[in-house]
Amino acid sequence: MERYAAALEEVADGARQQERHYQLLSALQSLVKELPSSFQQRLSYTTLSDLALALLDGTVFEIVQGLLEIQHLTEKSLYNQRLRLQNEHRVLRQALRQKHQEAQQACRPHNLPVVQAAQQRELEAVEHRIREEQRAMDQKIILELDRKVADQQSTLEKAGVAGFYVTTNPQELMLQMNLLELIRKLQQRGCRAGNAALGLGGPWQSPAAQCDQKGSPVPP
């Protein structure tokens, strides 16, 4: 009798999994219609079906939520670093202007052209330094964001999410961004309407609960 009950439960569980897969696939097919036609053509039925399978137990929603939170923290940190550098440059320029004004006021009139020429050379040197520091900061930001993208690609590939692998190809990156957007919108739909609206079971509640507490994830 126990064997029979276990077999029935296994069949019922399989049916529930099939239903969840169907609901996710239908939702994905509906969301894909909102994408540009060029990307719709690349998201075949097989790709969407594989994506729906990867989303079944809710783990991928958790992974995406975590990746986006890490990305946002990284972006905020890099933004603050650049802001600090800009403030340092602003203070440096103000101090240099003050120094030059005081020097001009203190010098004899016949020495003014010589002082001004020296000050112009100093100003050009400082502006060159500022440009170099800004360029280095921008390169650092680009490299750090590229590393984060590669980390996201690798993590989602290991999680079995269709369409994700490490690449720098612009078209593939755009496709992956669209796939992330589909996942995010599914998660938002779960936040707004609850699992019942999609016919999804318990495992998907955790990301929805996170949305209730922290707000919906923001696309990369």
Swiss-Prot record:
Localization in the cell: Nucleus
Coiled-coil positions: 76-159
Tissue: Widely expressed in fetal and adult tissues. Highest expression in liver, heart and skeletal muscle. Lower levels in pancreas and placenta. Weak expression in brain.
Disulfide feature: none
Stored InterPro entries: Gonadal
A single cellular component GO annotation: nucleus
Keywords, sorted A to Z: Coiled coil, Nucleus, Phosphoprotein
Pfam families in alphabetical order: DGCR6
Organism domain of life: Eukaryota
Protein family according to the UniProt entry: Belongs to the gonadal family.
Stated role: May play a role in neural crest cell migration into the third and fourth pharyngeal pouches.
Name under which the protein is recorded: Protein DGCR6L
Lineage: Eukaryota, Metazoa, Chordata, Craniata, Vertebrata
Gene name of the record: DGCR6L
